[in-house]
């Protein structure tokens, strides 16, 4: 079991060799993270989408102002996620656990999948301490959700505790890495020349505070077997040239229902939500 102390904060699942320049960059990144931590929680409260609109000025940022207004017509709420390099993974984790809090059957299946992933990681050669620390820590957390020990307010308190939240994130980083390694033949051709998949996973996926790139995003979505939609504030950022992108790829917009929807602003992801569909009430019988 992991002790919930700041000394145990994860930095990577493996040992990364760094140069002096890289250490300087890491120090600069950590300073930015510390500044961000002082300014915002890891996971914010749900807020009306009008909050997003208020961030942009019609005169100085007309394109973003227009897009924010368009989103506010489709989505009712936004949950801001701290921009610390973990925002995509954190948003996915929060969005998924929100679903599981209200879907016991899916929660039971998810726990079984997490335990299976622990075995898969061991077979892939991940260190035993990695699996016992990060995997067991996450599974214990999600089993407490299943058993009702962690209620919604407890879950969000944990998500906002640096001493525990980042251990939970490491499990998602590990299964992302594991999925890529299981499908190395499919993903290795997309890496920069001279970089092996093992190196990529160690430095870009398993290392904390690293932003998720396209390969990491696809791998996590597939590892979790979920469907997501990413809405883009910048119309030029979507891979298909549109205003949003569905994952896994190949789903038609008309039939695609995402489990989780993210908002991508340059370099950052937040969660956005549609208003729950209203249940139609039966018509009253005519008065005799």
UniProtKB/Swiss-Prot annotation:
UniProt keyword Hydrolase, yes or no: yes
CDD domains membership: Otubain_C65
Single GO molecular function: ubiquitin binding
Keywords, sorted A to Z: Hydrolase, Protease, Thiol protease, Ubl conjugation pathway
Binding locations of substrate: 175
EC number: 3.4.19.12
Lineage of origin: Eukaryota, Metazoa, Ecdysozoa, Nematoda, Chromadorea
Pfam families, per database record: Peptidase_C65 (PF10275)
Active site residues of this protein: 84, 87 (nucleophile), 244, 268
GO biological-process terms attached to the record: protein deubiquitination; proteolysis
InterPro entries, per database record: OTU_dom, Otubain, Papain-like_cys_pep_sf, Peptidase_C65_otubain, Peptidase_C65_otubain_sub1, Peptidase_C65_otubain_sub2
Domain OTU: 76-275
Family to which the UniProt record says this protein belongs: Belongs to the peptidase C65 family.
Highest taxon listed in the record's lineage: Eukaryota
Disulphide connectivity of cysteines: none
Protein name as it appears in the record: Ubiquitin thioesterase otubain-like
Role according to the record: Hydrolase that can remove conjugated ubiquitin from proteins and plays an important regulatory role at the level of protein turnover by preventing degradation. Specifically cleaves 'Lys-48'-linked polyubiquitin.
Catalysed transformations (reactions): Thiol-dependent hydrolysis of ester, thioester, amide, peptide and isopeptide bonds formed by the C-terminal Gly of ubiquitin (a 76-residue protein attached to proteins as an intracellular targeting signal)
């Amino acid at each position: 079991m992991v002790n919930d102390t700041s000394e145990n904060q994860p930095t990577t699942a493996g040992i990364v060799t760094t140069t002096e320049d890289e250490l300087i960059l890491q120090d600069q990144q950590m300073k930015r993270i510390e500044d961000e931590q002082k300014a915002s929680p890891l996971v914010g409260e749900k807020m009306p989408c009008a909050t997003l609109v208020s961030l942009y000025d019609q005169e100085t940022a007309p394109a973003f102002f227009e897009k924010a207004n368009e989103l506010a017509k489709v989505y009712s709420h936004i949950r801001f996620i701290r921009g610390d390099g973990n925002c995509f993974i954190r948003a996915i984790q929060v969005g998924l656990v929100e679903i599981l809090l209200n879907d016991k059957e899916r929660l039971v299946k998810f726990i079984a999948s997490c335990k299976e992933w622990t075995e898969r990681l061991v077979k892939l050669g991940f260190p035993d301490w990695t699996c016992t620390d990060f995997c067991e820590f996450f599974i214990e957390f999600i089993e407490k959700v299943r058993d009702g020990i962690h209620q919604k307010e407890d879950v969000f308190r944990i998500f906002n505790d640096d001493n525990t939240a980042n251990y939970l994130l490491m499990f998602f980083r590990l299964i992302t890495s594991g999925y890529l390694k299981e499908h190395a033949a499919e993903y290795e051709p997309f890496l920069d020349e001279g970089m092996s998949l093992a190196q990529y996973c160690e430095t870009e996926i398993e290392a904390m505070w690293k932003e998720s790139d396209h390969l990491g995003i696809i791998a996590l979505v597939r590892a979790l077997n979920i469907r997501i939609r990413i809405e883009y504030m910048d119309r030029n950022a979507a891979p298909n040239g549109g205003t949003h992108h569905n994952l896994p790829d190949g789903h038609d917009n008309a039939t695609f229902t995402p489990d989780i929807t993210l908002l991508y602003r340059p370099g950052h992801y937040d969660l956005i939500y549609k208003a729950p569909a209203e249940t139609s009430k039966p018509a009253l019988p005519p008065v005799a």
